[in-house]
Design a protein with these regions (language model features):
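Active-site rim helix/loop that mediates acceptor-substrate recognition in acyltransferases
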Residues: 25-45
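Conserved beta-strand-loop-alpha-helix junction that forms the acyl-donor binding cleft
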Residues: 110-121, 141
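Helix-loop element at the rim of GNAT/NAT acetyltransferase active sites that forms part
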Residues: 15-28, 66
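Conserved acyl-CoA
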Residues: 92-108
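Glycine-rich acyl-CoA binding loop
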Residues: 48, 86-94
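Conserved beta-strand in the GNAT
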Residues: 47, 53-62, 74, 79
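A conserved beta-turn-beta hairpin within the catalytic core of GNAT-like acetyltransferases
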Residues: 63-75, 134
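A short beta-loop-alpha structural element at the N-terminal edge
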Residues: 1-14
Length: 145
């Protein structure tokens, strides 16, 4: 298995992973999103590939904090193909994200996860990897007037 930055030929596999995560999208939409993300140095899209097939993805955003000095990393996306779960792939992706944050001078890694029943396994994974539930997130769709 290879942990590496995303490349153009990963598009179809990434689209499939996003669909598996429950986000309805197309290759064309994902191509536009990835182009924007990849052009911003604060975003890092890392994949796990086995035999040139992307089986996992982690999206990391580096940001500055108001509540402490330095930067932090926010995991904005994490998915491992259901056929490849419980094989250490998610942990390796998390480890790479952690390394990027440390290399950038940060010391905190955060994430949000839905509180739906189907997310219980993900929450257990996060807790087993040292994360602790500390807050409740809120979301609101907005549009211009």
């Amino acid at each position: 298995m290879l942990i590496r930055y995303v490349i153009e030929t990963d598009l179809a596999d990434i689209t499939d992973l996003m669909m598996e995560l429950g986000y309805n999208t197309t290759e064309s939409e994902m191509n536009i999103r990835l182009s924007k993300l990849n052009s911003n140095p604060d975003y890092h899209t890392i994949v796990a590939a086995i035999d040139n097939q992307v089986v996992g993805l982690i999206g990391l955003h580096l940001g500055l904090a108001y509540e402490f000095s330095g930067c932090y990393g926010r995991i904005v996306c994490l998915i491992v193909n259901s056929q490849y779960r419980k094989k250490g792939i998610g942990k390796q992706l998390m480890d790479r994200a952690k390394a990027i944050v440390i290399e950038s001078g940060g010391n905190t890694l955060v994430l949000n996860s839905g509180n739906r029943t189907e997310r219980v396994d993900a929450h257990n994974f996060y807790e087993n990897n040292g994360f602790s539930a500390k807050s409740t997130g809120f979301s609101k769709k907005i549009s211009s007037p």
